[in-house]
Regions:
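S-adenosylmethionine
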Residues: 1-404
Length: 404
C-alpha cells in the first residue's frame, strides 16, 4: 500500500478508497496515452481484485471525469490562485473529487477527506494545498452551475458537463426542455441491448436498439454495399436478418478507410459464423479508386463518420474532443460520400444514409442539400428515422431511405 507522511513525520497508510485510487489511475492513463476510457476500464476489470461494487464505482468516476472534463477543470480553476501552476498529477485527483461534488452530490466532508488522501498518494507535498482547495471547492459547489440554467446557456452547459457551443446548438435545434432531457440521459450509464445471432445457437451480440432499427432499413434481397462498416456490428445485424428473412446470408461488400478495422470485421464475422461478406479498404469519398469493388449494387448503405453526438454516454471522450470545425469538416466528408455512392446504386435501388449524430447539419440539412444536387435529384425520400438519447432507452441515431 502506498505510504504518506503524517504531521508527526511517521509513515501512515493512505486512506483513499481503492475505487477512487483506481479512477485516478485510469483517468491519468487517459490523459497520458490519449486512450479511450472504456477500453481501459474493460481491461482493468479483467484483472481487478476490487469487489464488483467498488469497481463499478471506479467506472462511474472514470467515465464521469472524462465526460465532464472541461466543466470540472473550470470548477477547479475557479478555486485556485494560479491554475497553471498545479501539477497534472494533482489535477487528476481533484477532477475525481470535483465530479463527486458537482454531479454525484456526495457529502462534501467525505469528498474533501478522500480528495486530500488521493493527492497525498500521488503528490504528498501537495496535500496541504489540496486540503485548502478542496474546502473552497466544497463551498463553491453549493452554487453550481453558477447561474440560471433556464436563461444562461453557460450555466445550462455546465449543468450537463458539455461545451457551451454544443449546448447552444442543441438548445437552438431542440428547445431547452428537450435538450435538457437528452443531456440528462447522456450523464447516465448506457443501457445494454442484445440481438440473437441466428448463425450460432444461443449466442447474442450487443447493439443499441436504434442502431438495430437503422440496419433493418437496408433491403437485403440483392447485393449490398456497406460504407463505413467499422468493426461490423451493422454488418452482423444485416446478415442476421438475412438468415431469418431470406434463409441465407446476403452478399455484402464493405468499405472502410482503415485496414485494421476491415481486418477486425473479417475476424469478427468468422467468429460469429457469418459468411457472405467481402471487405475492401479505401476512401469512400472516391469509390472509383477502390480496386475490385463492383460498380453497381441493389442497396448502398452509408454508415457515415459523424460527430457521435447521439452516443455521448457510450463515448465519454467525444464532448470535449470535438469542436465546430470538426462538424464542418465531417459534413463535407459526408456530402462527398453521398455524391460518390449515388452512382453505385442500380436504377430502382436504395440508398440508405445514417449517422449517430443528433445535429441537423449532419442529418436532415445534409440530406436536403444532397437531394438538390444533380446526383441527388435521381432519388426520392422514402423513409426517415430519428431517435434521441433517453433514460433507459436507445441512443441518438438518424437514417433516411432514398429510392433511385
Amino acid at each position: 500500500m502506498a505510504k504518506g507522511r503524517g504531521t508527526s513525520g511517521r509513515a501512515r497508510a493512505v486512506r483513499a478508497t481503492p475505487a477512487r485510487l483506481l479512477a485516478v489511475d485510469i483517468t491519468r492513463q487517459c490523459r497520458l496515452r490519449d486512450a479511450y476510457v472504456r477500453e481501459l476500464v474493460n481491461t482493468r476489470r479483467k484483472t481487478s481484485e476490487l469487489s464488483h461494487e467498488e469497481f463499478d464505482y471506479a467506472q462511474v468516476l472514470s467515465f464521469g471525469v472524462v465526460m465532464c472534463r472541461g466543466t470540472l477543470d473550470e470548477f477547479i480553476d475557479r478555486n485556485l490562485n494560479s491554475p497553471h501552476d498545479i501539477k497534472p498529477e494533482v489535477r487528476d485527483c481533484l477532477r475525481v473529487s470535483a465530479y463527486e461534488l458537482l454531479f454525484l452530490k456526495k457529502p462534501s466532508h467525505a469528498v474533501v477527506d478522500q480528495g486530500v488522501e488521493l493527492v497525498r498518494a500521488s503528490s504528498p507535498k501537495a496535500s496541504g494545498l489540496a486540503n485548502a482547495v478542496l474546502h473552497k471547492m466544497a463551498a463553491d459547489a453549493e452554487g453550481f452551475p453558477w447561474g440560471d440554467a433556464s436563461t444562461s446557456i453557460r450555466a445550462f452547459a455546465r449543468s450537463y458537463g458539455i461545451p457551451k457551443w454544443l449546448a447552444r446548438l442543441l438548445v437552438r435545434q431542440y428547445g431547452r426542455e428537450k435538450a435538457a432531457a437528452m443531456l440528462a440521459a447522456d450523464l447516465l450509464p448506457a443501457p445494454t441491448f442484445l440481438r440473437d445471432n441466428p448463425y450460432q445457437s444461443g449466442e447474442r451480440f450487443a447493439s443499441d436498439l436504434s442502431a438495430q432499427h437503422v440496419a433493418s432499413l437496408v433491403p437485403l434481397a440483392g447485393t449490398v454495399l456497406e460504407i463505413g462498416a467499422g468493426r461490423g456490428t451493422k454488418t452482423a445485424l444485416m446478415q442476421a436478418r438475412a438468415l431469418e428473412e431470406l434463409g441465407h446470408p446476403t452478399i455484402i461488400h464493405t468499405v472502410d478507410i482503415h485496414e485494421f478495422k476491415a481486418r477486425l470485421l473479417s475476424e469478427r464475422m468468422e467468429q460469429m459464423g457469418i459468411a457472405g461478406v467481402t471487405t475492401h479498404v479505401g476512401d469512400a469519398t472516391n469509390l472509383d479508386a477502390i480496386a475490385g469493388l463492383p460498380r453497381a449494387f441493389d442497396a448502398v448503405f452509408i454508415d457515415a463518420p459523424c460527430s457521435g453526438t447521439g452516443t455521448l454516454r457510450r463515448h465519454p471522450e467525444i464532448r470535449w474532443r470535438i469542436d465546430p470545425r470538426d462538424i464542418e469538416s465531417l459534413t463535407q466528408i459526408q456530402a462527398r460520400m453521398l455524391q460518390s455512392a449515388a452512382s453505385y446504386v442500380r436504377a430502382g435501388g436504395t440508398l440508405v444514409y445514417a449517422t449517430c449524430s443528433v445535429l441537423d447539419s449532419e442529418d436532415d440539412a445534409l440530406v436536403r442539400a444532397f437531394l438538390d444536387t444533380p446526383a441527388g435529384a435521381q432519388f426520392t425520400l422514402a423513409e426517415r428515422f430519428a431517435s434521441v438519447p433517453a433514460e433507459g432507452g436507445p441512443d441518438g441515431h438518424f437514417a433516411v431511405v432514398l429510392r433511385k
